[in-house]
Design a protein with these regions (language model features):
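Transmembrane alpha-helix segments characteristic
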Residues: 74-80, 124-129, 145-146, 170, ...
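Hydrophobic, aromatic-rich transmembrane alpha-helices
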Residues: 55, 60-61, 226-276
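Membrane-proximal, lumen/periplasm-facing interface regions of secretory-pathway glyco-
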Residues: 1-2, 337-392, 410-411
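Signature aromatic-anchored transmembrane alpha helix within multi-pass, membrane-resident enzymes
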Residues: 120-127, 143-147, 163-170, 314, ...
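Membrane-interface transmembrane helices that cradle and orient dolichyl/undecaprenyl
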Residues: 65, 106-122
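Hydrophobic/aromatic-rich transmembrane helices and adjacent perimembrane loops
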Residues: 5, 96-99, 132-137, 141, ...
């Protein structure tokens, strides 16, 4: 919501070198700004990402309903919602639900095109692919997978069909490419830095952002095994906010898809076309996911491959349906798997209800909060000390203070009377230390001229940057806190010491 906030404040979509994320395509962020401006509340953005997620679920369900029984449709929806991180996406002002909806639409259109033909469907696929990339760069895997699907389906017409689909996709993405080129010097900012360059960026930040060289291949033989079994490993090890996979996709969404192969001969003639299409779209995206995970430390994160979710949901639901037609003897595999699936979904639903009941977001989002459930109390429940710390900045440092964040990338709730400099790449410390060769004391004292205070996310610094296995530059990061405390004094901290506000020593 940082860019929508700035967009509403200035009325202009300009470059912000202090935060590279604002250089990404901003289709959904503009919709957030439109909703917030229309209703006068930033919580109105919830209508956008909630609506996008609902549209995606309806598209998955509607596609399956055309080719399979109704209960198959409902199972696909349940498998998606069984992932804790997925349903949390409905509650967050982020772009993943839009990517999911566009991916579901692309799969639906591809299924229709493969069964009925028609150049108009190619135009629609290009439109959806271009929109998806204009929402999030990683949706480029969807565009590539659609191209592969067109090639496999009609190889003799691939040039003609490819030109139609790719031409439409590029035309739809063109405004964002031009914006990147004009404002940032890079049509795909901040990627491809070696080719295009880009303001506020350099080779070190490019390597650090993608965690180049820290992929699964760097883990030796065990990493190769994890790479081959990536969907299963991401399911087993994926937790919300985790380091390597960073997503809870649910127990069965991806693993259950294997059953469609085991029970292929038991699918009906109506079910096979959608299963083939889902598999055809999924395989190239899986290959790209594995390639990213092999070479990059963040490439294996499930949150980056949201376009695979509609295909996985359809294949898993169809595979489960095929199991119902397996022989019951000598062992009723279908009964066993059904019990396990039901148990997992019920447990997930219970956890969801508990979380929603505890957070109680409805009244706040709709502007109907109570004295016991105000906006401030809701934000404290959902963001913890982060919101409290930011609200203290003007009281502790004074109006007009310039605050540099350390190891804290989020600054949306920064008071209007304070200028906040978020640590978007968490490299306010590391970048000058590693790339400029500056001494620790020199870095801190160099802040004196343009910084009045520092907001230090000490809990994240200590638990993640100093202790988390696999996080690089632990020794260099460990130099920060002592250097900070030599020149600045603690003015405020929350009860748990998670966030601290520092000011200069006299």
């Amino acid at each position: 919501m940082l860019l929508p906030k700035r967009l509403l404040q200035t009325g202009q979509l300009v470059a912000y070198p202090d935060n590279h994320y604002t250089g990404f395509p901003q289709t959904v962020e503009i919709m957030f700004a439109w909703a917030a401006g229309l209703f006068g509340r930033d919580t109105s953005a919830a209508l956008v990402h909630y609506g996008a997620g609902l549209l995606g679920l309806v598209t998955v369900a509607g596609t399956l309903r055309r080719y399979a029984e109704t209960h198959v449709m409902w199972l696909a929806v349940a498998l998606l919602l069984g992932g804790g991180s997925f349903w949390l996406g409905f509650t967050r002002e982020y772009v993943d639900m839009a990517v999911f909806a566009l991916s579901a639409g692309a799969l639906a259109v591809l299924t229709v095109w493969r069964t009925s033909g028609g150049r108009a469907w190619l135009v629609v696929m290009g439109l959806l692919a271009g929109l998806a990339v204009g929402v999030k760069y990683t949706a480029g895997m969807l565009a590539i997978a659609l191209g592969v699907a067109v090639l496999v389906t009609q190889p003799r017409r691939v040039v003609r069909h490819g030109l139609v689909m790719a031409g439409v996709a590029l035309l739809v993405y063109l405004p964002w490419g031009l914006r990147g080129l004009v404002q940032y010097g890079n049509p795909f900012y901040p990627f491809f830095y070696g080719v295009f360059g880009g303001i506020g960026w350099d080779a070190a930040r490019a390597a650090g952002f993608s965690s180049s060289g820290d992929g699964l291949l760097a883990q030796g033989p065990l990493g190769v095994v994890r790479l081959v079994l990536l969907p299963f490993v991401a399911t087993a090890a994926g937790t919300e906010g985790g380091v390597r996979y960073s997503f809870d996709a649910g127990v069965w969404l991806m693993p259950l898809a294997v059953t469609v192969l085991l029970g292929w001969d038991r699918l009906t003639d109506e079910e096979r076309p959608v299963a083939k299409t889902a598999g055809l779209l999924l395989l190239p995206m899986l290959a790209l996911w594995m390639a990213g995970g092999a070479l990059s430390g963040i490439g294996a994160q499930t949150r980056l491959v949201i376009p695979v979710f509609p295909a996985f949901a359809m294949l898993s639901a169809l595979g489960f349906e095929s199991m119902s037609r397996w022989p019951r003897r000598p062992m009723n595999v279908y009964f066993i798997v059904r019990v396990l699936v039901i148990f997992a979904l019920v447990a997930s639903a219970f956890g969801t209800l508990v979380t929603v009941a505890n957070n109680n977001p409805g009244g706040v989002i709709l502007g109907a909060g109570t004295p016991q459930n105000t906006r401030d109390s809701y934000l404290f429940r959902t963001t913890g000390a982060h919101y409290v710390a930011l609200q203290q900045l003007d009281d502790v440092l004074g109006d007009g203070a310039r605050v540099r964040f350390a190891y804290e990338p989020k600054a949306y709730y920064c008071p209007a009377t304070v200028y906040c400099d978020p640590d978007a790449l968490t490299d306010h410390w590391l970048h000058p230390l590693l790339t400029e060769g500056r001494a620790p004391d020199e870095i801190i004292t160099g802040w004196r001229d343009d910084v009045d205070g520092v907001l230090f996310f000490r809990q994240g610094y200590e638990q993640f940057f100093l202790r988390e296995p696999g996080v690089p530059f632990k020794e260099e990061n460990a130099l920060f806190a002592p250097a900070l405390e030599r020149y600045m004094e603690l003015l405020w901290e929350d009860d748990a010491g998670a966030y601290q506000i520092y000011g200069w020593r006299e």
